[in-house]
Amino acid sequence: MPVAKDNQFWDALMENKVAKKLIKKHKCKAKCENIDDLANRYEVSKQEVEKVFKIFQLMDDDGSGTISSSEVAKMLNELGIDVSPKVVQAVMRSSDVSGDGQIDFEEFLAAVTSKIKLSTVKADVQLMLSKIDNNPEKVISAEELVVAWSETVSTNITVKEACALIQQADTQGRGKATIHEFITMCQTV
């Protein structure tokens, strides 16, 4: 499974050491407005919204309130990441929902929070699957998936939902999935 070209950028930005270093390096004066609304809509804490806003401000060199592809390239360079046009395009394409060629704060917040949530879910799924069995060829039943899910992930799923997940992971149309197939399916989400 090839890694998305923008993942390296988002992973580096979200790494606490990098974020703290960037925030200390550049003092941001402006405040984020509508913190409560944004925190509720994106299901994150106010502190996370403020942290993401500070990082956004660091990237917005010209103070326009948006991030351009050249500002993304500059940040990639500062993070020590390959600044190829393809990587910059991948970051812009994954974030610029409006299609105007710029990333505004809400688009940036949406991209960052979705990456954070996805990495949390993937870690939860890995833990969940390790509770079922370490044999990657073991077949998972819907009932096993429901039990393991409830023990590791912060939400519950029904047997019907578990069946749908297994069906999606099933690459051979058998009506069942191995742990390996399930992991592969989760990595492509």
UniProtKB/Swiss-Prot annotation:
Residues 31-54 form a coiled coil. This is Uncharacterized calcium-binding protein C50C3.5. One of its GO terms (molecular function) is calcium ion binding. Ca(2+) 1 binds at residues 60, 62, 64, 66, 71. InterPro entries: Centrin_CML-like, EF-hand-dom_pair, EF_Hand_1_Ca_BS, EF_hand_dom. Transmembrane segments: none annotated. The keyword Magnesium does not apply. PROSITE patterns: EF_HAND_1, EF_HAND_2. Keywords: Calcium, Coiled coil, Metal-binding, Repeat. Ca(2+) 2 binds at residues 96, 98, 100, 102, 107. Residues 47-82, 83-118, 120-155, 157-189 form the EF-hand domain. Pfam families: EF-hand_7, EF-hand_8. Ca(2+) 3 binds at residues 133, 135, 137, 144. CDD domains: EFh (cd00051).
